Structures are given as structure tokens and as C-alpha cells.
């Protein structure tokens, strides 16, 4: 099974997670959130492990009774691939973390081609 981590479980991330769960050879090993929002219900209902974006946010989640499995770096270490669904201009900041861990990544947010070095658009690539 390919271990998939979703960094940014919001508008895009929750849809990516749904698509991953439909694959026979993939499993969600965790999702990252900056704060507990209404979108967390889907992650909790699906029993996705929840990771806080930073150590300072862990107590915020725990204050709402949400069990936290670690922080972003912890998820990056256990995942085979990270789908970065963070808002535009934030995802590129995670590139060094992914490279350092040797974890492959796909940016599914609003990143431009130049900093990432690759782009994909289903309209033009298929």
C-alpha cells in the first residue's frame, strides 16, 4: 500500500483524501490541519490520523477533544508521498522539509510552476 499524507485538509485536501480512499493500492496515513474546523468532521468520521501543523497547535486540537498523532514533520516521515493542499505560496515553503525526509510530494494547491519545477493541468496534459 502506498502511504499518502495530506498536508492541508480543507477545500482541496478533503476532496483529494476522498479520491485516495477510492484507490485499492493507497491509504491515508494522516491529514494536517492548522486548526480544528468544520472540515475536521469528515477526517474524524473517516478515522484519518490528525496531525497539527506545528507543535504549538497541538494543545488547541486537544482542547476540542481531538487526538493528535504528531505534527507535519512526523507525517512527512511516515508517508510515502505527501499531497500538499496548502494555500498558494505556502506549499513551496514545505519543499525543503519533503526533500530532507526523502518523501515525494505533489502540490495540489495554488503553486506556480517556477518554484516547484513542474505543473499539471488535466485540460492541457490529457
PLM region spans:
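N-terminal Rossmann-like NAD(P) cofactor-binding subdomain of oxidoreductases
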Residues: 1-126
Amino acid at each position: 500500500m502506498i502511504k499518502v499524507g495530506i498536508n492541508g485538509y480543507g477545500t482541496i485536501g478533503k476532496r483529494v483524501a476522498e479520491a485516495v480512499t477510492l484507490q485499492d493500492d493507497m491509504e491515508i496515513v494522516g491529514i494536517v490541519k492548522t486548526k480544528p474546523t468544520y472540515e475536521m468532521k469528515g477526517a474524524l468520521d473517516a478515522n484519518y490520523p490528525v496531525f497539527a501543523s506545528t507543535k504549538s497547535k497541538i494543545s488547541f486540537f486537544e482542547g476540542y477533544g481531538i487526538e493528535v498523532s504528531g505534527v507535519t514533520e512526523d507525517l512527512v516521515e511516515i508517508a510515502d508521498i505527501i499531497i500538499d493542499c496548502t494555500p498558494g505560496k505556502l506549499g513551496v515553503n514545505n519543499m525543503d522539509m519533503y526533500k530532507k525526509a526523502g518523501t515525494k510530494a505533489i502540490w495540489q494547491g495554488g503553486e506556480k510552476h517556477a518554484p516547484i519545477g513542474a505543473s499539471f493541468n488535466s485540460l492541457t496534459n490529457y
